[in-house]
Amino acid sequence: TSTSYPSIVGEMLASGFGVIGFSWICSPACTELEVVVMDWLAKFLKPPAHFQHASDGPGGGVIQGSASEAVLVAVLAAREQAVASYRESHPELSESEVRGRLVAYSSDQSNSCIEKAGVLAAMPIRLLPAGEDFVLRGDTLRGAIEEDVAAGRIPVICVATLGTTGTCAYDDIESLSAVCEEFKVWLHVDAAYAGGAFALEECSDLRKGLDRVDSLNFNLHKFMLVNFDCSAMWLRDANKVVDSFNVDRIYLKHKHEGQSQIPDFRHWQIPLGRRFRALKVWITFRTLGAEGLRNHVRKHIELAKQFEQLVLKDSRFELVAPSALGLV
């Protein structure tokens, strides 16, 4: 993980304020600054514009505690959407029958948090074999989905990875998104590590296919010099998550609920309370600047290439895969 002086200052200030920002009415600054910095990040990393709060659509971003939380939110939201949709088209089936048929997909190179999300969601996740280059592609996903559909199972979500833990491999988002659209399967992209490189034009290929994904997460506490915990998550249609997680007791209601420009982020996450994480992001960006953060990422990539050359010159070592970003 990474950190920096501005981030530490922001963390101290947030702790001092003691904000529990589960809704706008609790702390307007907490909610509104998070909306601002999530759109800043979206402009900085350049995923599709529909992920911004400022867009005309229902998309937007939220800060989760970790990639594990972001993936779990996506898996649970996709599950509830699939159950509602399938029961509408198959009213003869009970809810328990539908839930018993659900299945999800990911690569055998994906992070352990994805498999854990399946356990917590009570939904099996099939870990599909990646190719020799450690990449999961659409034809592999298609074969698995067709097999499950033939067996009466209900495909729900595919969790792809940009920057796998073992080799920093990048799943083929373009081919996976085409298959997911065909079978109406939610596509989530876990870019916890590689997402920081979206900001570099020389790494723009990593952004291919993101215009067709449903949700995306990226850890600022990796490349962005923001201390743990701080994981950005963007949703193409935030209403799908809100509809899945909305538990609105009378003591949580306020008169400004439902206004598009002031979201209640408690509906976008697992816990009720939430920390003022946006403050350390804001201070870090204001202090270091976009170009300073880009140069930090570039420096990591350059150091990895230098280390790779040292390894290649030493016969005692063997590279499992070519270096990618900061991983050798």
UniProtKB/Swiss-Prot annotation:
Its cofactor is pyridoxal 5'-phosphate. It holds the Pfam family Pyridoxal_deC. The active site is at residue 111. Gene3D superfamilies: Aspartate Aminotransferase, domain 1, Type I PLP-dependent aspartate aminotransferase-like (Major domain). Its EC number is 4.1.1.107. One of its GO terms (cellular component) is cytoplasm. One of its GO terms (biological process) is cuticle development. Keywords: Catecholamine metabolism, Cuticle, Lyase, Pyridoxal phosphate. GO terms for molecular function: 3,4-dihydroxyphenylacetaldehyde synthase activity; aromatic-L-amino-acid decarboxylase activity; pyridoxal phosphate binding; structural constituent of cuticle. InterPro entries: Aromatic_deC (IPR010977), PyrdxlP-dep_de-COase (IPR002129), PyrdxlP-dep_Trfase (IPR015424), PyrdxlP-dep_Trfase_major (IPR015421), PyrdxlP-dep_Trfase_small (IPR015422), Pyridoxal-P_BS (IPR021115). It catalyses: L-dopa + O2 + H2O + H(+) = 3,4-dihydroxyphenylacetaldehyde + H2O2 + NH4(+) + CO2. The modification N6-(pyridoxal phosphate)lysine is found at residue 222. Involved in cuticle development. Probably responsible for the protein cross-linking during the development of flexible cuticles. Belongs to the group II decarboxylase family. This is 3,4-dihydroxyphenylacetaldehyde synthase 2. It comes from Drosophila simulans (Fruit fly). The gene is amd.
